[in-house]
Regions:
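Conserved, mostly hydrophobic/aromatic
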Residues: 3, 87, 146, 260, ...
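Acidic/aromatic-lined carbohydrate-recognition and catalytic surfaces
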Residues: 28, 32-39, 47-59, 65-69, ...
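Short, solvent-exposed turn/loop segments enriched in Gly/Ser/Thr/Pro and often Arg
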Residues: 156-167, 324-329, 397-403, 446-449, ...
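Active-site-adjacent "subsite" loops/lids of carbohydrate-active enzymes
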Residues: 184-185, 190, 330-378
Length: 614
């Protein structure tokens, strides 16, 4: 027994196959974050994972309380035909309770496969009706146009996770306050019941739509206007049985989240600086705020109900694939609620590689694998279930994190001073499969970069679709695997136009980065080869030809970047930069009304739709 039993790897292998040792000091710090010195073994978890048809022996008699409420008296092996779900086994001799998770083990196949769709940063997809950023009304419009006129079957959006309920607003959708709830900034105010009765609605609408003239998205300005409008609607809200029923169905999680929002408005967004009585969800100030600020507490619950309703309406137009971020802001709602199962002194990142010689730290605290298991995985279950709400599919960002994560001590001199920590991936994948089965949704694992061989094998066995990018693949699209999503690029990588024109290389220099001229040259050669074009071909021709090549991929799902189709040269995010680049703030160059009539998106859609219909 020792360090390896706690999942901490004392060595790691880079992309070139070279092994590196982790310092004993780093190992000790990582173990300390788990509350151990590495002696002995982690305590057993309270959950038993079962697959249909698998005999599970049982000593003595017990009552099996099914999730639906029925109770079965069992002696000997558990029944092999248990329904999928979360059940509870209560032993008759000592009353000991064990969670029994019955999972199908594999995720559903995409119903419409093969099909295609747009990958879009929703905030960037503004229409003339938007208030400075794309919203759920825009998603509904984009989905209707894509499915009814273009023949597409999905829209992949950036994470819609909840941001902090205060100013300033975070620009990054991958650094949320909570992954269990969603961002009210995406609400279409005019679609909220009661909005037409506002006396100053017209002036608010005009001010909101004027924000569309700004070259970059100003979330703080959007927040101020939408908060003003929504608070006025709430003041006139007299109740709705549908809201009451929805609140009841959400359980304690919604109330705890709303309490965090009220406390954040009172004490500031970082709970670690709050008064001691509010610093833990069980603190006396938390119960007090639910009583003394009942109206404000309900207001934040109402906002989540509105988001849920508008997202449901948008999802009725097309299957929406929701993106699950790797983690959360440690100062936010999930960090507060789950502080006992998160390693708050650690940050998720990546070891050194050819792109980042010192490694990367993303500032997101990881789950402690053993405390998470000890909690019956409920935080993870809630996170997956929430992201699957009104979803046709689930994109798991950095899916390798279900197997292992690079933990960086916040005291480390650089991200290179970290270590890999392994997770109980079988349990986590069983939960993903069960939740996807319940939601009728497929799963896609973003498995780009350095990936252990067994990871892709296990994901394939679980029917989690792989990710294939033209930018990363040496093989032509026609040779990609079937069980995958294929695309040209992502939000962190150059667009076709940016690469082809050379503007992305110039942007790297503008952002203060070391321009990767050789890497750009190689990527451009790959693009030329895949698209089958001459080196001086017009960028519009290159874009269409590239997606025609992508259409030959046998993959179940294909996605096209809407910014790619419009010839956008700037990528949404420049990794390694902060204020040097307008990360997550670049809108599409045309409103959706213009997108619908522009030739580029129709040409790309026609190329991909031919594959889906052939």
């Amino acid at each position: 027994m020792g360090v390896a039993d706690w999942g901490v790897q004392e060595r790691w292998q880079d992309a070139q196959g070279k092994w590196h040792d982790v310092s004993p000091e780093t190992v000790a710090v990582v173990l300390a974050a788990m509350g151990t010195d590495g002696e002995g073994s982690p305590p057993p978890g309270p959950a038993l994972f079962v697959r249909p048809g698998a005999p599970i022996p049982l000593d003595g008699a017990a009552d099996l309380v099914l999730e639906a409420g029925a109770t079965l008296r069992v002696e000997g092996p558990l029944p092999t035909d248990l329904p999928f779900g979360y059940h509870t086994l209560v032993r008759l001799d000592d009353g000991r309770r064990t969670d029994v998770v019955v999972s199908p083990g594999t995720c559903p196949r995409p119903e419409l496969a093969p099909t295609w769709g747009w990958a879009v940063q929703l905030y960037a997809a503004r229409s003339t009706e938007s208030w400075g950023m794309g919203d759920l009304g825009d998603l509904r419009r984009l989905g209707r146009w894509t499915s009814q006129e273009l023949g597409g079957g999905l829209i992949l959006v950036n994470p819609l996770h909840a941001a902090h309920p205060t100013l300033p607003q975070s620009d990054s959708p991958y650094f949320p306050s909570s992954r269990r709830f969603r961002n009210p900034l995406y609400l279409r105010v005019e679609d909220v019941d009661g909005a037409p009765a506002l006396p100053d609605l017209e002036s608010l609408v005009n001010a909101g739509r004027a924000l569309n003239d700004q070259p970059h998205i100003d979330r703080d300005a959007v927040f101020r206007l939408k908060a003003q409008a929504l608070e006025q609607i709430w003041e006139r809200f007299t109740g709705d049985p549908a809201f009451d029923a929805w609140r009841e169905a959400q359980g304690d999680a919604l109330g705890d989240y709303a309490a965090f929002c009220v406390l954040a408005e009172e004490h500031g967004p970082d709970w670690r600086g709050w008064p001691e009585a509010a610093r833990h969800p069980d603190g006396p100030d938390v119960a007090e705020v639910k009583r003394t600020q009942y109206g404000r507490w309900r207001f934040h619950q109402w906002l989540q109900w509105l988001v849920d309703r508008q997202l449901q309406a948008a999802s009725a137009e097309i299957g929406v694939m929701h993106d699950l971020a790797v983690g959360v802001d440690p100062a936010g709602a999930d960090g507060w609620l789950w502080q006992d199962v998160l390693a708050l002194d650690m940050a998720v990142g990546a070891p050194p590689d050819e792109f980042a010689s010192l490694g990367q730290s993303w500032g997101l605290p990881p789950f402690d694998p053993w405390r998470l298991r000890g909690a019956g995985y409920h935080p993870f279950i809630q996170t997956i279930r929430a992201t699957l709400g009104h979803a046709g599919g689930l994109r798991l960002d950095h899916v390798m994190g279900l197997f292992r994560l690079w933990w960086v001590p916040r005291s480390a001199d650089s991200p290179a001073g970290g270590a890999y920590v392994r997770y109980c991936h079988d349990d986590l994948l069983d939960i993903v499969a069960l939740e996807c089965h319940r939601a009728g949704a497929y799963a896609v694992g973003e498995d780009l970069g350095t990936v252990e061989d067994h990871v892709r094998e296990e994901l394939a066995r679980r029917r989690v679709l792989s990710y294939r990018l033209v930018w990363f693949e040496e093989k032509p699209p026609a040779q990609y695997p079937e069980q995958a999503l294929a695309a040209v690029t992502t939000h962190d990588l150059p667009t076709i136009a940016g690469l082809w024109t050379g503007s992305d290389l110039a942007d790297q220099q503008t952002a203060g980065m070391e321009p990767n001229a050789e890497g750009t040259r190689q990527l451009r050669e790959r693009l030329k080869h895949v698209a089958g074009v001459d080196g001086d071909a017009p960028v519009e021709e290159v874009i269409t030809a590239t997606y025609e090549a992508l259409s030959r991929a046998p993959c179940m799902l294909l996605t096209a970047g809407l910014d790619d189709a419009l010839g956008v040269q700037k990528r949404p995010n420049m990794p390694g930069t902060t204020d040097q680049w307008p990360n997550w703030r670049i809108p599409l160059p045309l409103p959706l009304e213009g997108v619908e009539t522009a030739p580029g998106p129709r040409a790309v859609a026609a190329a991909l739709d031919r594959r889906a219909r052939s």
